[in-house]
């Protein structure tokens, strides 16, 4: 889809209106969890596309018209950030933050890591922050770029940054994107990442409730991003612990099945095992 030369939303006189426009979009994205996923990216390619599409419907009427006209672009390009990971080495840290890396001696890492970027850099250095992920700060940066695109009346920029914003917000809602044990590799639970964010939604998303109300204005988008990370991180122990408990109840031949996905037989967690895990989490994946 080409947007060059397309007429963008009317440029209001005050910058604050443009900022509120972006903040409302961010509010909608934070409101919307995921719906379904494939084995790609934080929520899978399909999941990220669905998040962006459904977030559009939470926007107020003055915003909805513009984004509805471009909803296919916003949805299709929701996965661009994941595709860039293969070409841009700076991209990967934008999708996560291993906040538990900063927890020493039982201290609360959220009390140790400053929420403001400049203060965090002063305390830990930028190299350290980049090494362990920067997703909450990158959400703020993308929102700023989106706001500037509105100021310029740059339709291409608006759509580009709005698509990216949805992606990073979605990533911040994944518990395993907030821990060094992101794939269970430290607890002998290899593969739990894709299990949680892909297999469960794949089998259950049709039953999820997608009616989430309207987006609300965010006074402090950086705090909202950090709150999403915090809410994700407090669920890490449950994500890992409940899977260990379910695993102990299932023999290997009931835990996995082989399915033909056009590339020969591929091993997946069984429907029975997946349901047992999802039931134990009491709908966590849908809520996130």
Per-segment meaning from a language model:
Residues 5-8, 29, 171:
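Generic N-terminal simple sequence motifs
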């Amino acid at each position: 889809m080409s947007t060059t030369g397309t007429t963008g939303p009317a440029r209001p006189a005050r910058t604050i209106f443009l900022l509120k426009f972006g903040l409302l979009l961010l509010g909608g994205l934070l409101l919307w969890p995921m719906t379904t996923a494939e084995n790609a990216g934080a929520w899978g390619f399909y999941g990220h596309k669905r998040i962006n599409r459904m977030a559009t419907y939470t926007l107020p009427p003055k915003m909805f018209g513009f984004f509805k006209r471009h909803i296919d672009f916003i949805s299709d390009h929701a996965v661009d950030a994941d595709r860039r990971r293969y070409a841009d080495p700076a991209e990967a840290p934008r999708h996560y933050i291993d906040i538990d890396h900063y927890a020493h001696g039982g201290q609360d890492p959220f009390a140790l890591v400053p929420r403001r970027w400049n203060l965090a850099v002063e305390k830990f250095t930028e190299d350290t922050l980049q090494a362990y992920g920067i997703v909450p700060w990158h959400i703020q940066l993308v929102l700023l770029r989106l706001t500037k695109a509105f100021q310029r009346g740059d339709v291409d920029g608006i759509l580009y940054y709005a698509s990216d914003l949805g992606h990073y917000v979605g990533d911040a809602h994944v518990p395993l994107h907030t821990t060094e044990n992101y794939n269970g590799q430290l607890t002998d639970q290899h593969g739990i990442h894709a299990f949680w964010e892909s297999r469960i939604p794949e089998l259950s998303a049709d039953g999820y409730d997608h009616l989430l109300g309207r987006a609300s204005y965010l006074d402090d988008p950086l705090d909202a991003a950090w709150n999403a990370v915090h809410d994700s991180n407090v669920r890490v122990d449950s994500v890992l612990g409940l899977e260990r408990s379910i695993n102990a109840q299932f023999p290997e031949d009931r835990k996995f099945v082989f399915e033909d996905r056009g590339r020969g037989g591929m091993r997946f967690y069984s429907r029975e095992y997946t349901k047992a895990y999802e039931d134990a989490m009491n709908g966590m994946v849908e809520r996130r």
